[in-house]
Amino acid sequence: MSTGPPTAALDVRALLATLDRHAVRYTVIGGIAVQVHGHRRTTKDLDVIPAPDEANIGRLVRALAELDARPRDAPGAGPPTAQQLASAPTVPPLTTRHGELHVMRDVPGAPPYADLRARALVVDLDGLPLAIAGIDDLIAMKRASGRAADLRDIAALTAVDQPER
C-alpha cells in the first residue's frame, strides 16, 4: 500500500517523449508491454529497464530531473542520483509530472540487457521509437514474479497466440 502522495494520471506519451529527448535507452516491460503484445488491460504506471551503461544512466538522471521524479513513498526526497540508479538493487517507484514510473534494474526472469534489447519489438508511438520486451522475455519475467496478476497476464498472452477453434 502506497503511503506517498497521489501521482499524476499516467501519460505514457509524455513520459516516453522525455526519455527520448534525453536519448535514454530502455526497454519497456510490465503492463504497457503486455498491452502491445495484445492483452488489453489497464495499468497505472510505466515499467522500464534502462541500458546499464554509465552514459545512459547519466541521461536517465537528467530525464528524471526534468520529470520532477521523486520516490513515491518518500515525497520529501529528491530524484534518484546516478549512483543510486547504478547500484541500488531496487529503485523505488517514482512519481512524476506525467504519472508513475518504475525504473527496474534486476528483474527476476529477465535476460542481460543486451539480450533483452536485441529481442525487443520496436514500435512507433506517434513518432517515438519504443522498444517493448519480446513476448518470450516478458512471459519469463512474469513467470519468475509469480504474482497473481502476472499469471493472469501469462494466460492472456499465451491465449493470444492460440488459433481460434
Task: List PLM regions with ranges.
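Compositionally biased terminal segments of proteins
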Residues: M1-R165
